[in-house]
Amino acid sequence: MPIYHKLGTIPHKRHIQFTKPNGDLYYEQLFGTVGFDGMSTNSYHEQRPTQVKEIRAQYSVAPIIAKPNNIQSYRLRGFEVPAEDDFLESRKIVLTNSDCHIVLAAPRKSTTSYFYKNTDSDEMIFIHKGSGKLRTIYGNLDFKYGDYLIVPRGIIYKIDFDTEDNRLFIVESHAPIYTPKQYRNWFGQLLEHSPFCERDIRRPEELETYNEKGDFLIKVKKNDEIFDLIYASHPFDVVGYDGFNYPYAFSIHNFEPITGRVHMPPPVHQTFETTAFVVCSFVPRLYDYHPLAIPAPYNHSNIDADEVLYYVDGDFMSRNDIEAGHISLHPAGIPHGPHPGAAERSIGKKETLELAVMVDTFKPLMVTEEALKISDDTYFQSWLE
């Protein structure tokens, strides 16, 4: 996140002696991204962060592909994904390509017996149902319905839920997740026309420091496999850090919509971006106010991108028979648009209360076996009259 952040105690300069009260050194770690060119954080540890005692299990979590080359539109009933106790086991990859995984999860329990580190991907975790606390090596973030949690790759975390009925929409991105460049100046500051600003970004608080030795299980994801690593010290042993690479939260309810006299294109709803996809937030807003406006979107040939919409709440103006938790996939190569009657119904309406998250990928998405378990195979015919 291009906002400088500091928690805990740090020395006045980088890479100099920083000693404990007994005279021993704290252990400095540079956590960089994109080699030495991306955002980074310097942290200071009670113990060496390199002490691996054992490498135990190694197992694949790669998705099983059902349709590697797809041109069919799909509707997935996301709430039909069964709830499971374990956070990682509950994650079901429904759509994927070489740049990202799109995941549904319904974990019932907090992560108590292990820590997790995804070295493959930045994670965008959207909280559809549930609340709790994301506990990380860089401090804690409270979360609730409507929050996006952005966890850069390699950050060790646990997730604690206050509830058992939890529904998450997750995107794992092999490229870093940033705020949209059209909303930033050359310093990285969000501009006046941005639909959100730095005040809306929640940064970690409550830096918990544990100077403990023992056996600590960290599940590390690398190349779509999980490695069970036993570390000799508690990973949350940071006494202080500063930098730009840390997890943060942003509520979809703080996204300020951009409207116009006629229908505005999806880029005005953009919230995050990578080199491989964009994320948009559709939120309650006033409709278009031209006297002859048609608030429903026009038909669109997304010839260069697959469109994924995750429906959160409200009535989505352009679709029929869509419920909370549904996902629609409109693949590149064929046009999509409002369902029959949707455009006519929208005329004269003053506002919409819809809430949805859109992911547009620049490479085609493959459909997994997990997706077919919850799919409506006739959805592509729902535009027939």
Task: Name the predicted role of every residue range.
Residues 1-385:
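Jelly-roll (double-stranded beta-helix
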